[in-house]
């Protein structure tokens, strides 16, 4: 009699519409219960039985119940699942398999089985890629996943690399394919094989992109010719190899090895500017005035060169600093190094006065054994030879940015707009509390940004600099010329690494059109979006592999008295994140390790400080001594403790 009763249906509808609901993201805890986080201020408790229906990170709608003035959330509808495609470790065997996602807050095993067409017989400990197929909030009884790819066995020494690449869906090897002969591009190549070009790289580098040649012009002027490897002489636009490079967008540099954008035959041989080998190149010649200014007579041209020496950063730096036993092989090479050093110093001075110069941070290099074990991690400071190459490349990229802007009106540009206009007032207010007064309109201009950066660089510590970083916008890849506030430049377009960056290959094709006086189409927005997405994924992959290797390296230091100097990089309610100065590892110091009485402790992200009993004890950028309290291998996290 109650079936299809319109009154009953109406009553149900009313009850449904009157029941309070909230949409938010599920946050799991290690204790079985969870929270529905609606926004920064509001969250609802989810009891353990209800947590069985959801997973950490799910975006859901929940019914809000109130009992004895206590609110709790009952998950009702799934808006967006946290897990779709994921990597994890297999448990069980034969017909009863489950997979534990490789995520710090997902501990529960999910029942699974191999998808059709996946031949591998999965066993306990195997690593796999899986895709979620069932979810309790979608009317299914339980969670269920399908194994779509075998990654590797539990005892593979290279698990960190293979699992990370699979997680981010990135290629694990060099592309196949060969370029048999150079294209006829209708370019006249200048023969520069007699000139004393040199390459300066790490000793182990095989994919040499750039060669340099300098000469004196008189009146304090110097001429710099930058010759860049020419892969577009071999790879036609729209060809199979070009499409592979477009998808990869960059060579992926991971600790221990790289996965190139181009086949190794090209990247490490045919295109690489090897010593004593004749190679096609795209070249830029510029005049550098006595004060470091790049004059207007910039010329781009196609060339053939023969590098006369493969030089290594450390050797060149040692020689210029009068240390070590290395000597240039000839007076001509010695003369080149001296001239390039002069260009470096003069351009560095010009950028210091008219643009912006980054503070030197060391690069950290993992030294690995045959089985992927970390033998050591060394900090490699940026020395004079690194700066010679850096200044030459920046100068060449400024030249390309100008020529592409003036001749075509487009290109692949690196654009950075400085501060987000929405943050200008908050920025000015923060600076004012530290005695710096800025005009909110002025600081959004390139000139105003550079002025502020120079004032910050003159501060006794980097504390204020670190506070305002959160107000900055992100660098973008754009086809439209625009300023790069971070470098303090009106425009910046890279073309000096075409073996490892697809955007640089595009700029080569555009520059060749300029050289030939031809028209050419503007690059498509989808291409820049793909490059931005790949850059993001490659950076995450590098960080993930690094975290794994740092955990392996520091595992035997856990619980010991070994001290490490550590710079505080971030402070949150839960504690402090620090970077170990000697090796670059990130570690976390939980708030209870800072002070035992929670009520007397204030960890403020807003002010970047930790206060104990009202006194500021720690601030971001402080360097403190720590020991390693614990290394959690399953989450690759390092827990540190300040030395009392």
Swiss-Prot record:
EC number: 3.1.13.1
Pfam family, one: OB_RNB
Gene Ontology CC, one term: cytosol
Enzyme class: hydrolase
Transmembrane regions: none
Catalytic activity: Exonucleolytic cleavage in the 3'- to 5'-direction to yield nucleoside 5'-phosphates
Keyword annotations of the record: Cytoplasm, Exonuclease, Hydrolase, Nuclease, RNA-binding
Any one GO molecular function term: RNA binding
Domain of life from the UniProt record: Bacteria
Single GO biological process annotation from the record: mRNA catabolic process
Domain RNB: 189-516
Primary role: Involved in mRNA degradation. Hydrolyzes single-stranded polyribonucleotides processively in the 3' to 5' direction.
Family that this chain belongs to: Belongs to the RNR ribonuclease family. RNase II subfamily.
Annotated HAMAP family: RNase_II
Protein name as annotated: Exoribonuclease 2
Organism of origin: Citrobacter koseri (strain ATCC BAA-895 / CDC 4225-83 / SGSC4696)
Lineage of origin: Bacteria, Pseudomonadati, Pseudomonadota, Gammaproteobacteria, Enterobacterales
């Amino acid at each position: 009699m109650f079936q299809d009763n319109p009154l009953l249906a109406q009553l149900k509808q009313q009850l449904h519409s009157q029941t309070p609901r909230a949409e938010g993201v599920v946050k799991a805890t290690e204790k079985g219960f969870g929270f529905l986080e609606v926004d920064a201020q509001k969250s609802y408790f989810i009891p353990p039985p209800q947590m069985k229906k959801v997973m950490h990170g799910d975006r859901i709608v929940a019914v809000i119940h109130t009992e004895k003035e206590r609110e709790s959330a009952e998950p009702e509808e799934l808006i967006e699942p946290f897990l779709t495609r994921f990597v994890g470790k297999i448990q069980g065997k034969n017909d009863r398999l489950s997979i534990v996602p490789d995520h710090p807050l997902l501990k529960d095993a999910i029942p699974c089985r191999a998808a059709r067409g996946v031949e591998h017989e999965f066993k306990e400990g195997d690593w796999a890629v899986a895709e979620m197929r069932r979810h309790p909030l979608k009317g299914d009884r339980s969670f269920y996943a399908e194994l779509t790819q075998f990654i590797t066995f539990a005892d593979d020494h290279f698990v960190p690399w293979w699992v990370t690449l699979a997680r981010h869906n990135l290629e694990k090897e060099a592309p196949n394919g060969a370029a048999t002969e150079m294209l006829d591009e209708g370019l006249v190549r200048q023969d520069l094989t007699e000139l004393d070009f040199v390459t300066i790289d790490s000793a182990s580098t095989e994919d040499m992109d750039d060669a340099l040649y300098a000469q004196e012009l008189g009146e304090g002027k110097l001429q710099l010719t930058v010759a860049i490897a020419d892969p577009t002489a071999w790879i036609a636009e729209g060809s199979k190899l070009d499409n592979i490079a477009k998808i990869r967008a960059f060579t992926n540099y991971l600790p221990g090895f790289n996965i190139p954008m181009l086949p190794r035959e090209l990247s490490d041989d045919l295109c690489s500017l090897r010593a004593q080998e004749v190679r096609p190149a795209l070249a830029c010649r510029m005049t550098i005035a006595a004060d470091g200014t790049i004059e207007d007579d910039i010329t781009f041209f196609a060339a053939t060169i023969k590098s006369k020496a493969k030089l290594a950063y450390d050797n060149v730096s040692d020689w210029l600093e009068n240390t070590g036993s290395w000597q240039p092989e000839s007076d001509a090479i010695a003369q080149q190094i001296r001239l390039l050093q002069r260009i470096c110093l003069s351009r560095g001075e010009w950028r210091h006065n008219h643009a912006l110069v980054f503070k030197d941070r060391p690069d950290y290099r993992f030294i690995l054994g045959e089985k992927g074990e970390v033998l050591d991690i060394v900090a490699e400071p940026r020395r004079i030879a690194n700066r010679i190459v850096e200044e030459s490349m920046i100068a060449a990229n400024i030249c390309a940015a100008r020529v592409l802007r003036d001749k075509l009106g487009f290109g692949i540009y690196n654009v950075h707009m400085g501060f987000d206009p929405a943050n200008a007032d908050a920025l000015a207010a923060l600076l004012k509390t530290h005695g710096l007064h800025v005009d909110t309109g002025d600081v959004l201009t390139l000139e105003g940004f550079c002025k502020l950066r120079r004032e910050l660089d003159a501060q006794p510590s980097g504390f204020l600099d670190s506070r305002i970083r959160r107000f900055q916008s992100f660098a973008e890849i754009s086809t439209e010329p625009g300023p790069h506030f971070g470098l303090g430049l009106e425009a910046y377009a890279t073309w000096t690494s075409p073996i490892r960056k697809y955007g640089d290959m595009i700029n080569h094709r555009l520059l060749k059109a300029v050289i030939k006086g031809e028209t050419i189409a503007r690059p498509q927005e989808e291409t820049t979006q793909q490059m931005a997405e790949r850059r993001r994924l490659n950076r995450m992959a590098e960080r993930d592999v690094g975290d794994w290797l740092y955990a392996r390296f520091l595992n035997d230091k856990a619980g010991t008295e070994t001290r490490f100097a550590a710079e505080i990089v971030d402070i949150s309610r839960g504690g402090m994140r620090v970077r170990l100065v000697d090796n670059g590892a990130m570690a976390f110091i939980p708030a209870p390790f800072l002070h035992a009485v929670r009520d007397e402790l204030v960890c403020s992200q807003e002010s970047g400080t930790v206060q104990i009993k009202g006194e500021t004890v720690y601030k971001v950028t402080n360097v403190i001594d720590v020991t390693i309290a614990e290394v959690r291998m399953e989450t690759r996290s390092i827990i540190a403790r300040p030395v009392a």
